Amino acid sequence: MVHQVLYRALVSTKWLAESIRSGKVGPSLRVLDASWYSPGTRQARKEYQERHVPGASFFDIEECRDTTSPYEMMLPSEAHFGDYVGNLGISNDTHVVVYDGDDLGSFYAPRVWWMFRVFGHRTVSVLNGGFRNWLKEGHPVTSEPSRPEPAVFKATLNRSLLKTYEQVLENLQSKRFQLVDSRAQGRYLGTQPEPDAVGLDSGHIRGSVNVPFMNFLTEDGFEKSPEELRAIFQDKKVDLSQPLIATCRKGVTACHIALAAYLCGKPDVAVYDGSWSEWFRRAPPETRVSQGKSGKA
């Protein structure tokens, strides 16, 4: 097996603070606030406008998605993604650092990290500890809007990192890939409802294994060490030497599985973009498992 040199998936708050202090934010280094919150809770863009990491732009995941899809957070086209990030001053040569303001330390940032990778961009990192720890450690913030000079970003979809409904359905027969679901246990089992979901019962895809993404984070909001991450996968009998598909409700926290595996030296985890929100609406009933009222999701 050839071991490729992996780009650093995490950068520290100290490293980013020093990079900002030394004036490195610009065409070669861009910072993105990728916060998103459930409607009626926090307002991500408003919070960004009030305070953010100096030089950071707001990455609106509601804008940078396939808005024509009936499913929740499907990838945009190559052209849409390229135009969107190009307008944030990002070229194919830019090192991109992504963070969010979630209380967990990280929630949506790994989704944007994966989006860059699935569109062919290697030099992207998540801010370890997120905005929560940036603030806690007393690093500078600003309300000043960021106005980066637009750049040209050519997006090239890496289909090996993305799985479709048809591919996951075929995998139920072939079992070539392990299927790992990152949602909380109750939602996976079908004993707790999907939050803010209309017409979407909880449950899981037959044959999937549950590894809740919160397990990858420390109480302080940092990513656990590669040794701890490996132990989490091993405990659930997930073999990191074998192919793996990550799934969740809408393709967001599945990216935490991709990130955790990457930190263990496995960069090839594919994400099922439609995840449960698509599977529940399209898949045959016998492929949907739930311990809820009806027994089948």
Curated annotation (Swiss-Prot):
CDD domains cross-referenced by the UniProt entry: TST_Repeat_2, TST_Repeats
Location of region: Hinge: 144-159
Modification N6-acetyllysine occurs at: 14, 136, 163, 175, 224, 236-237
Keyword Cytoplasm: no
Tissue expression as described in the entry: Expressed in numerous tissues.
Residue positions, PTM N6-succinyllysine: 14, 136, 175, 224, 237
UniProt key word Transcription regulation: no
PROSITE patterns xrefs: RHODANESE_1, RHODANESE_2, RHODANESE_3
Active site location: 248 (cysteine persulfide intermediate)
Modified residues (Phosphoserine): 38
Broad class of where this protein is predominantly found: mitochondrion
InterPro entries, per the entry: Rhodanese-like_dom, Rhodanese-like_dom_sf, Thiosulphate_STrfase_CS, TST/MPST-like
GO biological process terms on file: epithelial cell differentiation; iron-sulfur cluster assembly; rRNA import into mitochondrion; rRNA transport
Gene Ontology CC annotations of this record: mitochondrial matrix; mitochondrion
Sections of the chain in a coiled coil: none
Domain Rhodanese: 25-143, 173-288
A Pfam family matched in the record: Rhodanese
GO molecular function, one term: 3-mercaptopyruvate sulfurtransferase activity
Keywords associated with the record: Acetylation, Glycoprotein, Mitochondrion, Phosphoprotein, Repeat, RNA-binding, Transferase
Domain of life: Eukaryota
Record comment regarding domains: Contains two rhodanese domains with different primary structures but with near identical secondary structure conformations suggesting a common evolutionary origin. Only the C-terminal rhodanese domain contains the catalytic cysteine residue.
General function of this protein: Together with MRPL18, acts as a mitochondrial import factor for the cytosolic 5S rRNA. Only the nascent unfolded cytoplasmic form is able to bind to the 5S rRNA. Involved in the formation of iron-sulfur complexes, cyanide detoxification or modification of sulfur-containing enzymes. Other thiol compounds, besides cyanide, can act as sulfur ion acceptors. Also has weak mercaptopyruvate sulfurtransferase (MST) activity.
Complexes and interactors: Monomer.
Protein name: Thiosulfate sulfurtransferase
Originating organism: Rattus norvegicus (Rat)
Gene: Tst
